[in-house]
């Protein structure tokens, strides 16, 4: 049974900058996970249902207009979860609308935590490294337009790989 995820990819040059930082702070998973904003967390789907998932995602993409994301500064989920992330200061509600659209039908999943759009920069590391990540990227800032999202499939050898892109409907 395949494991899939759905996410907004962070564009270059910021994707590589944030992934390289994540690697430098000691997060061994960084090279297996493209820099992203999660919409659907890792989800195991039944064999033979990928086509239905793709059809659903295409319909969801038609229901949401492109939007702008502005990333600035850092945040954390500690003490609940050992995660440090770059925060969204613009595009939060649009990410919520998009996540709601994709997490229906075959991708209706119960979330472990409430949805909070973010870009992870350090995960499951000792507190000193999480503190370092929080401080080092406190001044990080970028802005980009979101016109699509991606379906990712997990491969045990190569990690998460985008397999299909879904364009958001053009703004009226």
Language model: regions and residue ranges:
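Basic, often amphipathic N-terminal segments
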Residues: 1-68, 76, 91-148, 161-172
């Amino acid at each position: 049974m395949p494991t899939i995820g759905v996410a907004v990819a962070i564009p270059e040059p910021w994707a590589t900058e944030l992934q390289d930082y994540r690697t430098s702070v000691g997060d061994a998973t960084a090279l297996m996970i493209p820099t992203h904003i999660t919409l659907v967390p890792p989800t195991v789907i039944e064999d033979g249902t990928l086509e239905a998932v793709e059809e659903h995602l295409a319909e969801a993409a038609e229901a949401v207009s492109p939007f702008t994301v502005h990333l600035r500064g850092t945040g954390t989920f500690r003490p609940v979860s050992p995660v440090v992330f770059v925060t969204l200061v613009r595009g939060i509600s649009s990410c919520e609308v998009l996540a709601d659209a994709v997490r229906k039908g075959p991708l209706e999943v119960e979330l472990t935590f409430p949805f909070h759009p973010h870009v992870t920069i350090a995960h499951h590391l000792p507190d000193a490294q999480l503190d370092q990540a929080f401080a080092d990227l406190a001044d990080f800032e970028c802005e980009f337009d979101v016109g699509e999202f991606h379906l990712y499939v997990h491969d045990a050898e190569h990690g998460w790989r985008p397999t299909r892109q879904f364009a958001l409907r053009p703004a009226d």
